[in-house]
């Protein structure tokens, strides 16, 4: 399969005098393609949530069955991010991403014609598995086309694609309901989003680009020697093209302490994020006595506050922090700790909403910065594998801690037990942010030493 998806190095070489102009144009196309592609993945993922009232009403599914379907997708997606992102290292990013979108669309068409619970469950699992084909190609593309000094801003732009994608699902499905009618709820909920996803898949194929070498250009490392990162591994002399996806994953990710540090950062970020977002509605309704309308407003602010903060964080990490991602992440987590206490203890409706919005504004920043850091601690050909480890750890462990364990703590100890759990997660996150930052500084020193040695050799040869 990967042989089919791999395009290989282009036989056509871009003339030297056109390299810079072509490179600039292609990398913008590459970024737009993964932005639109990842946006589309959310159209055929979040549409399931919008269909749940009809699953209960029309198919007579219980709340437990609907919850089980949601859990199946979450677990399948977490596993898939680990596996699919590693496989993406050996495939053409744009073809891999487009293929995943088409497969998700096919599954959604199947959902549009299904009525049995177990068929739904199987299709939801397949959808979760194919959803994992979106994130790896996105990070691989950014790592292939954009230098370290720009990845904060570029990564921030890409990161809001999931906010945009999640935001346009409701209008798409709503328009489909208005045209088709509620009697065709399965077509409106599943088949129409599937058709939209196929259109986006075609856009990815037409607009997207493979790696620079696949497009007849020099690699990023050849054009910008400062991008070379020295990694101490046993197999650095072995050509990546001759290594399997497992060998790359084992050599450059599993054995890398920095890859584990950043994965554990994500575990605790997801723990806090899912602990807030999963329990915010019931907490505000039952404990803070919000109305449903007031709760909806607080929930909206929690989600949409992330867009401006993520864009600002990308600029700050590039410009103010000079490409060092974790200091800003640690600052955000410390502020979240304070806001979480305010959210818990405040009795004012306004202040609870403000604290919830501030947590939402800040929590996506360390998640996004961890994504950018991932691209900078492993070679470009292992980015997908590192993203896969992060994805697996964050969803299987982080999301579970924030949802299931939080619920257990609330049942056993009350709400204060759940909040103590989240505060402990914040402290652990700051610790691993620090360890990841220290590891990144070590890699930076190695890179500078390598460049210094290279300059010394060139000077000696010239003399």
Regions flagged by a language model, labelled:
Residues 48-52, 252-311, 367, 371, ...:
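Extracytoplasmic gate region of multi-pass secondary transporters
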Residues 80-92, 310-322, 410:
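Helix-to-loop junctions at the C-terminal end of transmembrane segments
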Residues 153-171, 393-402:
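Glycine-rich segments within core transmembrane alpha-helices of 12-TM secondary carriers
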Residues 79-118:
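Conserved MFS/SLC helix-loop-helix module at the cytosolic interface between two early adjacent transmembrane helices
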Residues 323-370:
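C-terminal transmembrane helical hairpin of 12-TM major facilitator-type secondary transporters
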Residues 123-161:
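Cytoplasmic helix-loop-helix junction between adjacent transmembrane helices
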Residues 90-101, 319-333:
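Cytoplasmic membrane-interface "Motif A"-like loop-to-helix N-cap segments
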Residues 158-212:
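Helix-loop-helix hairpin linking two adjacent transmembrane segments in secondary transporters
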